[in-house]
């Protein structure tokens, strides 16, 4: 358990719950970054989120530079790809990046609003 916590701390980003994400959106104008593939978007997404699939994020990361000062919360279906997205963002000098714990599934479980 301690080893997992050390590894998590060394990543340079943290996981946030859906409730924490809502607070960051409301108080700090956080950007929700949907890193799912296009064919997954029909399942719904978080309002006003920016879509950049993980498969193209490295090539298109500059599109996020205008948001570099804001918190960026990456999400996917369950939270695995969003961690990889956070690593890419950190390597490109984004400093305030987070991963949505549980992904869009966690968001749904928390009964938070979505758009189709």
Where are these regions (language model features)?
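Rhodanese-like catalytic fold shared by cysteine-dependent sulfurtransferases
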Residues: 1-30, 38-71, 77-116
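Conserved beta/loop motifs at nucleotide-recognition and modification sites
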Residues: 33
